[in-house]
């Protein structure tokens, strides 16, 4: 289960309540302290208080402040689904689907085109469970089924602005991001440097560790 939570300073571009997303609850982001960073930008200051909440993106955040910080930093409309950690994923048995082995030794899952959408923990809607299994097996992705039916829009992968990168040196700030390559990047700087190296093929899967 993805979890985002550390002591961080995030770019603070707005105050007040986060938008009330589907099934979500408003979080008053204006109650959290802010400061000014070296670049003169207002930043939101969060601590490590362990009061986990589940965001509408399916990620468990350490506390309300961290949810606000990620949402504001990346311009999302993620709000609070409920207090406590996000619920466990729905079990699925990928071994029940037929498969074959390619000439180069890779296992390929054989799927039909039946349309029975499921939502993956990566925020992607798959046409059916078999196709989710195919992605998991063939790409080695750490993705599971969150629920039957398509993902809500809050779960869609967030576009990260990497226009100011690459940068030769990144800070040690620990605000993890999970990339579409199933690798965890320590912060936005590390992630964006990797995006540049990939010629833009790398995207954000979700906040927190993979």
UniProtKB/Swiss-Prot annotation:
The glycosylation sites are 34, 77, 93, 99, 199
Indicate the segments forming the Kazal-like domain, all copies. 25-88, 89-153, 156-210
List the residue(s) that the UniProt entry marks as the site Reactive bond 1 for endoproteinase Lys-C.
48-49
GO biological process annotation, one example? response to steroid hormone
Q: Which Pfam families does this entry report, sorted A to Z?
A: Kazal_1
Cited InterPro entries: Kazal_dom, Kazal_dom_sf
An example of a Gene Ontology cellular component annotation for this protein is: endoplasmic reticulum
Q: Secretion signal: which residues?
A: 1-24
Entry annotated with the keyword Glycoprotein:
yes
Q: Where is this site: Reactive bond 2 for trypsin?
A: 113-114
List UniProt keywords, sorted A-Z: Allergen, Disulfide bond, Glycoprotein, Protease inhibitor, Repeat, Secreted, Serine protease inhibitor, Signal
Thermal dependence: No decrease in activity observed after heating for 1 hour at up to 80 degrees Celsius. Retains 20% activity after incubation at 95 degrees Celsius for 1 hour.
Compartments reported by the entry:
Secreted
Q: What is its main location?
A: secreted
Site location (Reactive bond 3): 172-173
Q: How does activity depend on pH?
A: No decrease in activity observed after incubating at pH 2.5 and pH 7.4 for 1 hour. Retains 20% activity after incubation at pH 12 for 1 hour.
Which cysteines bridge via disulfide bonds?
Answer: 29-68, 46-65, 54-86, 94-133, 111-130, 119-151, 162-192, 170-189, 178-210
Domain characteristics, as noted in the entry: Avian ovomucoid consists of three homologous, tandem Kazal family inhibitory domains.
Q: What does this protein do?
A: Serine protease inhibitor. Inhibits trypsin.
Protein name, per record:
Ovomucoid
Q: What is the source species?
A: Gallus gallus (Chicken)
């Amino acid at each position: 289960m993805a979890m985002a939570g550390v002591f961080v300073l995030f770019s603070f571009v707005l105050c007040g309540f986060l938008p009330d997303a589907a099934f979500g609850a408003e979080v008053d982001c204006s109650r959290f302290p802010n400061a000014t960073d070296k670049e003169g930008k207002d930043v939101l200051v969060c601590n490590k208080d362990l009061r986990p909440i589940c965001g509408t993106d399916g990620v468990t955040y350490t506390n309300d402040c961290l949810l606000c910080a990620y949402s504001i930093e990346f311009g999302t409309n993620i709000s609070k689904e409920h207090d406590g950690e996000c619920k466990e994923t729905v079990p699925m048995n990928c071994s029940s689907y037929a498969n074959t082995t390619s000439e180069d030794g890779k296992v390929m899952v054989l799927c039909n085109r039946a349309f029975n959408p499921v939502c993956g923990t990566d925020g992607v809607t798959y046409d059916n469970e078999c196709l989710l299994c195919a992605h998991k097996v063939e790409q080695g992705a750490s993705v599971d089924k969150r629920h039957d039916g398509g993902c809500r829009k809050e779960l869609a992968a967030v576009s990260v602005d990497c226009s100011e990168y690459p940068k030769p040196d990144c800070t040690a700030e620990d605000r993890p991001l999970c990339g579409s390559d199933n690798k965890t990047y320590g912060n936005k700087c590390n992630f964006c440097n990797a995006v540049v190296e990939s010629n833009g093929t790398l995207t954000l899967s979700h906040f927190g560790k993979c």
